[in-house]
């Protein structure tokens, strides 16, 4: 009797559908763009920082289990103004020579309306910049490619937006010319790996 019970349990376990695991994603041909916005002497200036590495995992069955671990190459940060770019990478701001990478690691996904990563969704995480780690929150959107089938999650578009104070990370240089508040807008084209 014990043997039959054991076999029945074994077959029941085999019959259960496998639990879905998070799917790894990589950057697609469109890559990722991190755009930052800051105020320099009263005018808005935009710059970009390229993504160095991205380890992304999305779990369609449990979106709150999705994760992101992304680095940006601070040495390649750019603005439209050469003097602003050099000041940005200087020791008193990003100190690119000593801290060549920034890193974001997600800690929590909070879903928006309808249980989706859009419509009010946020991603919390830790941002390390200049060797200083602080918690940050981004408004998050995750979409299928336009024209794709409803169940086609092979190619997705991601957008994250947030704001923060550069002084929280010790980037205090040129405070007489550059406001403390910085906006961040990240757009990424990702593909299932």
Predicted regions and their residues:
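Low-complexity, acidic/polar, glycine-enriched regions of mature
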Residues: 20-193
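N-terminal export signals
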Residues: 5-21
